[in-house]
UniProtKB/Swiss-Prot annotation:
The protein's role, per its UniProt record: Functions both as a transcriptional activator and a repressor of multiple genes encoding virulence factors as well as genes involved in environmental adaptation. Represses genes involved in iron homeostasis. Modulates intracellular levels of c-di-GMP which in turn regulates swimming motility and biofilm formation.
Protein name: Transcription factor AmrZ
InterPro entries assigned to the protein according to its UniProt record, in alphabetical order: Arc_DNA-bd_dom (IPR005569), Arc_rbn_hlx_hlx (IPR013321), Ribbon_hlx_hlx (IPR010985)
Consequence of gene disruption: Deletion shows increased swimming motility, decreased biofilm formation and very limited ability for competitive colonization of rhizosphere.
GO molecular function, one term: DNA binding
Keywords: Activator, DNA-binding, Repressor, Transcription, Transcription regulation
């Protein structure tokens, strides 16, 4: 089992899918995304991913254990420190990293 790699891509190359939202849902998603310091897209992706993880649909690779031999020492330390953060801090950090990755991809 290989560790999950975070794909770096720009919005131009990302897979796109149109979703029809019920009345008022767009505004609710926007508000929640603001509270989590994320874009609406990042909020939707995070919630879909969490739902799929809970159902077991994304497989074991996303539930990497700290004692996994596939984790390097640095990855293990990052994961351990990440898990010590509050949920809000985790969301902010993930949002920051995703934003930086998008900016780097757009610069190329």
């Amino acid at each position: 089992m290989r560790p999950l790699k975070q794909a770096i891509y720009s919005s131009r190359t990302a897979d796109k899918f149109v979703v029809r939202l019920p009345d008022g849902m767009r505004e609710r998603i926007a508000e929640v995304a603001r509270n989590h310091h994320r874009s609406m897209n990042s909020e939707i992706i995070a919630r879909l991913e969490q739902s799929l993880i809970q159902e077991g649909a994304l497989g074991e690779e996303l539930s990497m254990r700290l004692d996994s031999p596939e984790l390097s020492l640095h990855e293990r330390e990052l994961l351990q420190r990440f898990r010590q953060l509050s949920h809000r801090q985790q969301n902010a950090l993930v949002s920051l990293i995703a934003h930086d990755a998008e900016m780097a991809a757009d610069a190329t």
